[in-house]
Amino acid sequence: MEELLIENSHRFTIFPIQHPECWNWYKKLESLTWTAQEVDMCKDIDDWEAMPKSQREFYKQILAFFVVADEIVIENLLTNFMREIKVKEVLYFYTMQAAQECVHSEAYSIQVKTLIPDEKEQQRIFSGIEKHPIIKKMAQWVRQWMDPTKNSLGERLVGFAAVEGILFQNHFVAIQFLKEQNIMPGLVSYNEFISRDEGVHCSFACFLISNYVYNIPEERIIHKILKEAVELVDEFINYAFDKARGRVPGFSKEMLFQYIRYFTDNLCFMMQCKSIYKVGNPFPQMTKFFLNEVEKTNFFELRPTQYQNCVKDDAFAFKLFLNDDDF
């Protein structure tokens, strides 16, 4: 029986802390708290309209993936991990992660509503799991490895790390290249905050695998899960580049193929496994971002002095209540 799944009938409160390392992970995640309305996307609208159509198509595919992916992550946390795991410090982490994933999901919805005014096109993106075969395939793969009736806790944690790491990482990289072009500051800011959060989520899964999981999956199983994730990313990249007619400034799909393999080898190291691909980093100029080392001070520098929202939709409008008279 896994320690993480054993009920302690004598423990009702979080204090005294019994698992200090897990508690430190929770406090780290707590320190990164932000809200979806704290990013100003007003300048992004003009940048988006000035962007070549092929480039916009590429980033639309990424947004279509993200609006689906975070919902599936939330689903796994609420229906599986948060019901099964009994170690309070770990449960606190996953409770905080679920809240963060809700912020991420809202943020991606705001991005779609801000950049894409046409409601039919918005709906096509929000329905990505139905409209894009590769996104549906990725969602099915995630649910397959998150199924507690078919996979051990260790296998599911490996799959979860692959989702938070491998499936998301190339999309983070692609958006971050917009910063080098000095465009889309709001989208880039969202990307930095979300990728930083996801980096902690992924690292925590690896920490649990290495330090708490008793029945650690065999290396061949870990490699199988990670390689399947890489193959899905390859398929998505090909699909997105086809939509963009092969033209995306800043990088080629071959560079993204190489990067995701470089990242996967680092994930292997974090899980104390042998590397699979043994390739170098094709984007050395962005190493700091790839290591999820966005400076925390930048988070506060990027916050607007007033909450702003460029979405022309009452359902997405944000109101800051200043006093009781506003209620």
UniProtKB/Swiss-Prot annotation:
Q: Which Gene3D superfamilies match?
A: Ribonucleotide Reductase, subunit A (1.10.620.20)
Q: What induces it?
A: Expressed in the early phase of the viral replicative cycle.
Keyword field? Deoxyribonucleotide synthesis, Early protein, Iron, Metal-binding, Oxidoreductase
Its required cofactor(s), as named, are: Fe cation
Positions that bind Fe cation 1:
70, 101, 104
Q: Where is the signal peptide?
A: none
Q: Which reactions does this protein catalyse?
A: a 2'-deoxyribonucleoside 5'-diphosphate + [thioredoxin]-disulfide + H2O = a ribonucleoside 5'-diphosphate + [thioredoxin]-dithiol
Going by the record, the broad EC class of this enzyme is oxidoreductase
Q: Where is the active site?
A: 108
The UniProt function text for this chain reads:
Ribonucleoside-diphosphate reductase holoenzyme provides the precursors necessary for viral DNA synthesis. Allows virus growth in non-dividing cells. Catalyzes the biosynthesis of deoxyribonucleotides from the corresponding ribonucleotides.
Q: What is this protein called?
A: Ribonucleoside-diphosphate reductase small chain
User: What species does this protein belong to?
Assistant: African swine fever virus (isolate Tick/South Africa/Pretoriuskop Pr4/1996)
